[in-house]
Amino acid sequence: MAQLSFNAALKMNALGNKAIHDPTNCRAKSEGQMMWVCSKSGRTRVKMSRGSGGPGPVVMMSSSTGTSKVVSETSSTIVDDIPRLSANYHGDLWHHNVIQTLETPFRESSTYQERADELVVKIKDMFNALGDGDISPSAYDTAWVARVATISSDGSEKPRFPQALNWVFNNQLQDGSWGIESHFSLCDRLLNTTNSVIALSVWKTGHSQVEQGTEFIAENLRLLNEEDELSPDFEIIFPALLQKAKALGINLPYDLPFIKYLSTTREARLTDVSAAADNIPANMLNALEGLEEVMDWKKIMRFQSKDGSFLSSPASTACVLMNTGDEKCFTFLNNLLVKFGGCVPCMYSIDLLERLSLVDNIEHLGIGRHFKQEIKVALDYVYRHWSERGIGWGRDSLVPDLNTTALGLRTLRTHGYDVSSDVLNNFKDENGRFFSSAGQTHVELRSVVILFRASDLAFPDEGAMDDARKFAEPYLRDALATKISTNTKLFKEIEYVVEYPWHMSIPRSEARSYIDSYDDDYVWERKTLYRMPSLSNSKCLELAKLDFNIVQSLHQEELKLLTRWWKESGMADINFTRHRVAEVYFSSATFEPEYSATRIAFTKIGCLQVLFDDMADIFATLDELKSFTEGVKRWDTSLLHEIPECMQTCFKVWFKLIEEVNNDVVKVQGRDMLAHIRKPWELYFNCYVQEREWLDAGYIPTFEEYLKTYAISVGLGPCTLQPILLMGELVKDDVVEKVHYPSNMFELVSLSWRLTNDTKTYQAEKARGQQASGIACYMKDNLGATEEDAIKHICRVVDRALKEASFEYFKPSNDIPMGCKSFIFNLRLCVQIFYKFIDGYGIANEEIKDYIRKVYIDPIQV
């Protein structure tokens, strides 16, 4: 076939699937050849010929009767004494002719790789330069610092930090407001602008700026009532600012109904604060500068951090300095003004938050493998400051916050650090609701996203993680439904994490989603908006795009090799099976370039396993399966003369492949591993024989019997052993069983495969006469149970298995190569994806098609 464009080839394939995969043929052979032809109701020996008109219907000449029959593409009338089933799967979407048309400049040109290498160096420099944190200026906080007074030599007051006042004077935006010009949030602009106007008015300067700022505030105050959500502690801080503005004679509409409502709300909070004066962190620290009139300044000093700040907040610290004259407060603020050039950020230091956020960002973008050492250094730093109380933005933070703590829990656990989920209990009230930090009764949306992602990594019986999940999932789903935030990037992230939690998130799919929604001008919100330049970073995004496309180009070359092998081996002509080369390749979930040999071996073996599964389920008789299995046990191709030719061909292709891959294993491991490799294959085919015996006898096993057999026949054992031996790490004989069958983690992943598969395939299998499934076996054991009861039970079993598998994966094991362990563990991902909605292997032309296109076919625009 001549080379077509990719889209043309895909279109032709879609139109031609039925004809190419005629279910009446086992293997399509040349005219005049003798062959077995297998229909869904039987098998016969035929000679291939065509009518005199040239291309047209196939005429099959029976060697036993001499009769002929024209077979249409839907015919299934060839009958003998051996009944056959047909699953009627759709054809291969990504067959040889489609994949071979793929072209990409990212493989041939060295320019892209050279630029990627340059970016890696620059981002490593960024890691190495991490200190106490890099963060954008805050007009709100700088204005508070500008308001601090000192006594001059003549006894009059003057600004103690004139550089801060100068910054406020020089940084008004064109619309009269202060803030981050590219991002408008009403609460943010009102806080920044009102306090800036106050600072200028206190020192009777910047009259033009005050006039413009006042006009902006007056126009926008009326819009507050339309806001769906106010920024954290806005109802405490903003009314206090308005009181100060009114005292200074700034002309604003103070009698607006919503402003009165805010003032009433604040008064109620002040009453609560006064009643709980001994519990200062729980009620004051997050909005300290909004509580001046009820503050006991002597008591508050015991909550000062080592660096002199209060909750790392320049605004709160400036307020304390104004009321106490504390020198440590002065030193903290003065150091910030020097560091940031006359202004201050909304919080400092942020050394823990910045390191965790940078690592999380890098890994989400799919480029973490370039920075393994830098990530380790960053996380070692965070772990040194980890506390069972949780952590805050910086190492000296006295009050932990949920966002940093949950992010720390997730990131540290992902990298094998010993951290307890009990730390989350510090952010939960008696009703099971979580809050952002001590003293707050609300929770920020971003904190809930991080909490949800942390709960993904739950181990068995971790109550704190279960509580986090119960709280976070409905909260996020409700946020999506009600659109309580206008932050597009955050909403896209919420959509992804809710739809594809950790046990369902293929790394390349996650990277593609994150890259597509990445905003290199992203802002976060505390009291006001802020940026972290290490995260709002175009270099990270550029590298992620280049890296994705470069790796994708390698994957395309591998897919070309694999589809070519599938075709040249003759397996593409076997028509009782699903042809799923690209789907099996996707299932490995291992994308790194150095694991090319692993992916190729896994895909070749996995494709044959799909074929064997269909052969056992819908084609072979029990005697044929036994003969096939005997050939596997004896490692002998001469025992197969009694089975159909197509089964003989499948055996020979498999036999040759295993021998070839074993030769590659010998080169990596330095010894012959065939004895290890044969064991899981024998177990695998023995289970198929057992299943067929049960089927032919009409026996439905108990749930326990079912799992012992069917969790093996799902096939992870034979399709993973050789691939992990090709990962470049030496695997000792005694370690094989620790990472592979019968290790706990391996059995748990296999269990999740088997049962998740059952929830989406049992009805089709039942229609074919295959009664045994996890659902049927559970119902047999539990009389009166419905299919719905069985599926709920199976989902609970799978959930438990995934938690236990996580525990086994993160459990320290110095003798087990981490790459091998990760390969086995990551196989849990694809089954959750493939069987999320439907049987994704049987019906791969819907959701799975889109995954494959995004990961392997469509490059990212650079």
UniProtKB/Swiss-Prot annotation:
What biological processes does GO assign it?
paclitaxel biosynthetic process
Gene3D superfamilies hit by this protein:
1.50.10.160, Farnesyl Diphosphate Synthase, Terpene synthase, N-terminal domain
Q: Do you know which InterPro entries this protein is assigned to?
A: Isoprenoid_synthase_dom_sf, Terpene_cyclase-like_1_C, Terpene_cyclase_plant_C1, Terpene_synth_N, Terpene_synth_N_sf, Terpene_synthase-like, Terpene_synthase_metal-bd, Terpenoid_cyclase/PrenylTrfase
The note on the cofactor says: Binds 3 Mg(2+) ions per subunit.
Region feature (Disordered): 45-66
Q: Which cofactor does it need?
A: Mg(2+)
What CDD domains does this protein map onto? Terpene_cyclase_plant_C1
List the Pfam families. Answer: Terpene_synth, Terpene_synth_C
Pathway info: Alkaloid biosynthesis; taxol biosynthesis; taxa-4(20),11-dien-5alpha-ol from geranylgeranyl diphosphate: step 1/2
State any single GO MF term.
magnesium ion binding
Protein name per the record = Taxadiene synthase
Q: Which organism is it from?
A: Taxus chinensis
